[in-house]
C-alpha cells in the first residue's frame, strides 16, 4: 500500500460537541470514556455513575440525564463489546467489574441493574477489554499484576495470569490468541492464556515513566517508551526475534517522538498501519505511517485544550464518502467531548476503495466454547461496500448488499453495452420530445405576449386621441361666457343709474316752492 496515501492524513476537530460533561477525574491508567457507532459512555463525577448518550446526537448533558447508577465505586475503565454495541463493561476501584445492557434507543430512565458482576480480583481493576474474535471472552487487569480471563455470560474465571508488576496497558492480539501487558517494571509480558503461561518477558523501557503498547499484527507490536538518553520513542518489536527473556532483542525500528515525560499511548490502525501517539495532558496528536515497513512522520494535529482521555472509533463507523480514515473522541478540561476526524485531503472527494481494505464487521468468528477448546480464527472482515450497518455512510455504494461476482464474456459485455445504448437512445428521444414541447409552449407564450402588447398600444393611442379632442373643445365653450358677462353688467349699470337719480332731481324743487310762498 502506498504510504503517500496515508502520510498526509489531516486531523480536524468537528464543530459539534457534547457539553456539560461532568466526567470524573479519578487517577487511572484506563479510559474515562468509551464510544461506538451507537453510544458514548462517560464515567460521571458522582461515584459509580455512567452517562450514556447517542454518539451521533450532540447535546448539552442535562443535570437529570438518565444514567447508570447504583454501584458505589469509582469507574477506572470503560469498553463496549465489539459484537454487541449495547453491551458495556465497566471496571471499578473496589475490585469489581460490571456488565450493563443498554436498552434499544438509549437510556430513558436510570439503569440500576447490571447483567453480570465479576468480583474475583483482590485489587483495583484499571483495565477491561473484550476478545476481538471470540464472543463473551473478557480480560481484566488489576493492580499487582493480576490478569484474569473470564466468561462474560456466566461471570466465571477461565484462567488467572500473573504479570511481573502492575500493568500500565493490557491488550488482546488481533487474533484473540495472545494477551500483552506493559508493566511498571519497564517490561512487556506476552501471555498465551489457553496454555496458561507467559511466552515473552521483554525489557522495553529504560526510564521510570509508564510505557504503553499496541498490537500492529499478531507478531509485531509498537511501544511508547524512553531510552537511556531520556528520548521518548515509538519502537516496533517482533516477538519472533526475541530469544531470551529480559533482553533488548526483538526491536525492529524506532522513531523519536520528543523528550517530554508525559505518558503517551500508541493508537494503532491495523488496516492502514497508521500510528497515533497521544499523550495525556497534551493537546497534540502525532501521526506516523508504517505501511511501507518504516516509520514516516505524518502531519501533527494540535488542539486548543489538553486531552484528559481519548478513545478511537471502530473503522466500520467512519464516513467513507469524506475519505475519513480514522476518528477519535476526546474529553478535555472544559467539560467537553468532541470528535477529531482524520481525512485524506483530495480535490474530488468520493469513495476510494484503495484507501479502505476489508474492515472488521462486528461479527464474532468464535464462540466462547470454541475459543476455550483451542480453535483459532482471524476477525471476520468484509469489503466496505458489503457492510450492512447504520453507522456506515448512507451513500448507496457503501451499504449495498453483498453481490455474487459474475464473470462476463466479451459477448455478454457487448450485449450489455448495446442494451445501455438502446436505453440511452430512448432517453434521448424522450428528452427531444420534451424539448420540442417546451419550445412550442415558449412560442405560444411569446405570441400571447405580443398580442397583449399590441392591444395595450392601441388602447394607449385611443386614450391619447380622446384627450386631444377634449383639449380642443374646451376653449370654444368657455370664451363666449367670458365676453357676455361684462356686457350684461354694463347694461344693468346704465339702466339702473338714471332711474335712481332722476326722481331725486324732480322732488327737490317741489319741496322748496311752498317754503318761498310762506315767507312771502
Predicted segments — roles?
Residues 1-29, 264, 281-282, 290-423, ...:
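Terminal intrinsically disordered, low-complexity extensions flanking WD-repeat/beta-propeller proteins
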Residues 1-153, 159-163, 204, 225-228, ...:
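WD40 beta-propeller repeat fold
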Residues 11, 49, 147, 188, ...:
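Residue-level marker of intrinsically disordered, low-complexity segments enriched
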Residues 48-49, 168, 204-209, 213-217, ...:
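A general secondary-structure boundary signal
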Residues 87-92, 99, 121, 137-139, ...:
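Generic alpha-helical hydrophobic packing signal
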Residues 118-309, 314-317:
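WD40 beta-propeller repeat blades
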Residues 240-243, 253, 400, 406, ...:
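N-terminal non-cleavable signal-anchor helices
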Residues 410-413, 417, 421-520:
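Charged, low-complexity intrinsically disordered regions
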Amino acid at each position: 500500500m502506498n504510504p503517500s496515501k496515508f502520510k498526509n492524513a489531516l486531523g480536524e476537530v468537528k464543530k459539534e460537541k457534547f457539553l456539560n460533561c461532568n466526567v470524573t477525574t479519578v487517577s487511572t491508567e484506563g479510559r474515562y470514556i468509551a464510544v461506538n457507532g451507537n453510544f458514548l459512555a462517560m464515567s460521571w463525577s458522582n461515584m459509580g455513575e455512567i452517562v450514556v448518550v447517542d454518539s451521533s446526537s450532540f447535546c448539552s448533558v442535562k443535570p437529570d440525564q438518565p444514567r447508570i447508577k447504583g454501584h458505589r465505586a469509582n469507574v477506572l475503565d470503560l469498553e463496549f463489546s465489539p459484537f454487541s454495541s449495547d453491551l458495556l463493561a465497566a471496571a471499578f476501584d473496589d475490585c469489581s467489574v460490571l456488565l450493563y445492557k443498554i436498552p434499544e434507543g438509549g437510556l430513558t430512565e436510570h439503569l440500576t441493574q447490571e447483567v453480570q458482576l465479576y468480583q474475583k480480583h483482590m485489587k483495583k481493576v484499571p483495565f477491561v477489554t473484550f476478545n476481538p474474535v471470540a464472543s463473551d471472552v473478557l480480560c481484566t487487569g488489576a493492580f499487582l499484576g493480576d490478569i484474569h480471563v473470564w466468561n462474560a455470560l456466566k461471570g466465571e474465571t477461565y484462567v488467572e495470569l500473573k504479570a511481573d508488576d502492575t500493568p500500565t496497558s493490557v491488550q488482546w492480539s488481533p487474533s484473540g490468541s495472545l494477551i500483552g501487558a506493559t508493566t511498571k517494571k519497564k517490561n512487556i509480558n506476552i501471555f498465551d492464556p489457553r496454555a496458561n503461561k507467559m511466552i515473552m518477558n521483554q525489557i522495553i523501557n529504560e526510564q521510570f515513566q509508564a510505557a504503553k503498547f499496541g498490537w500492529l499484527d499478531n507478531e509485531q507490536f509498537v511501544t511508547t517508551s524512553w531510552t537511556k538518553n531520556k528520548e521518548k520513542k515509538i519502537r516496533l518489536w517482533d516477538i519472533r526475534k526475541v530469544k531470551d527473556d529480559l533482553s533488548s532483542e526483538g526491536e525492529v525500528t524506532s522513531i523519536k517522538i520528543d523528550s517530554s515525560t508525559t505518558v503517551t499511548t500508541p493508537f494503532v490502525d491495523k488496516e492502514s498501519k497508521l500510528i497515533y501517539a497521544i499523550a495525556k495532558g497534551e493537546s497534540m496528536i502525532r501521526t506516523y505511517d508504517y505501511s511501507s515497513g518504516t516509520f514516516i512522520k505524518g502531519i501533527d494535529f494540535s488542539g486548543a485544550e489538553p486531552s484528559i482521555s481519548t478513545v478511537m472509533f471502530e473503522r466500520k463507523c467512519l464516513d467513507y464518502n469524506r475519505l475519513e480514515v480514522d476518528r477519535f473522541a476526546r474529553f478535555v478540561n472544559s467539560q467537553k467531548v468532541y470528535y477529531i476526524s482524520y481525512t485524506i485531503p483530495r480535490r474530488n472527494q468520493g469513495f476510494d476503495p484503495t484507501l479502505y481494505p476489508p474492515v472488521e464487521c462486528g461479527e464474532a468468528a468464535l464462540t466462547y466454547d470454541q475459543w476455550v477448546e483451542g480453535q483459532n480464527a482471524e476477525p471476520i472482515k468484509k469489503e466496505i461496500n458489503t457492510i450492512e450497518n447504520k453507522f456506515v455512510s448512507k451513500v448507496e455504494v457503501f451499504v449495498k448488499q453483498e453481490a455474487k461476482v459474475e464473470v462476463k464474456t466479451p459477448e455478454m459485455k457487448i450485449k450489455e453495452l448495446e442494451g445501455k445504448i438502446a436505453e440511452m437512445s430512448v432517453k434521448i428521444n424522450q428528452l427531444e420530445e420534451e424539448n420540442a414541447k417546451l419550445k412550442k409552449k415558449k412560442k405560444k407564450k411569446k405570441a400571447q405576449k405580443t398580442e397583449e402588447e399590441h392591444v395595450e398600444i392601441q388602447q394607449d393611442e385611443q386614450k391619447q386621441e380622446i384627450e386631444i379632442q377634449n383639449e380642443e373643445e374646451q376653449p370654444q365653450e368657455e370664451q363666449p361666457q367670458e365676453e357676455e358677462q361684462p356686457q350684461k353688467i354694463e347694461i344693468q349699470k346704465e339702466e339702473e343709474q338714471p332711474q335712481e337719480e332722476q326722481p331725486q332731481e324732480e322732488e327737490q324743487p317741489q319741496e322748496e316752492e311752498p317754503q318761498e310762498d310762506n315767507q312771502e
